[in-house]
Amino acid sequence: MALWLQAFTLLVLLVLSSPGAQSASSQHLCGSHLVDALYMVCGEKGFFYQPKTKRDVDPLLGFLSPKSAQENEADEYPYKDQGDLKVKRGIVEQCCHHPCNIFDLQNYCN
């Protein structure tokens, strides 16, 4: 079943990347569909993917400056309200929130 799904995904990507399908070559790919498409496009090269896992933060605590519980680092930042203006440029932003094509996917291969 998984092999059939992979073959079908590859076929869809090939059809969408053909010269006659330029208007339909971009599509939204999210979640497992995005991962499957990356597996198909990148093949043996692979791609950068790390599933979310819980990390131990204890080793990182040594990098933090000791502050009292009442102090808040965000209060010291004069432009804290403009923090929402950050531009996200990851594969989810590029291929899930906006349509992407096979060439966009190739940019994420190793």
UniProtKB/Swiss-Prot annotation:
Signal peptide range in chain numbering: 1-23
Propeptide: 56-87
UniProt-listed Pfam families: Insulin (PF00049)
InterPro entries: Insulin, Insulin-like, Insulin-like_sf, Insulin_CS, Insulin_family
Example GO biological process: glucose metabolic process
Primary location group: secreted
Cysteine disulfide links: C30-C96, C42-C109, C95-C100
Keyword terms: Carbohydrate metabolism, Cleavage on pair of basic residues, Disulfide bond, Glucose metabolism, Hormone, Secreted, Signal
GO CC entries: extracellular space
Job of this protein: Insulin decreases blood glucose concentration. It increases cell permeability to monosaccharides, amino acids and fatty acids. It accelerates glycolysis, the pentose phosphate cycle, and glycogen synthesis in liver.
Subunit structure, as described in the record: Heterodimer of a B chain and an A chain linked by two disulfide bonds.
The family this protein is said to belong to: Belongs to the insulin family.
Name of this protein: Insulin
Organism: Pantodon buchholzi (Freshwater butterflyfish)
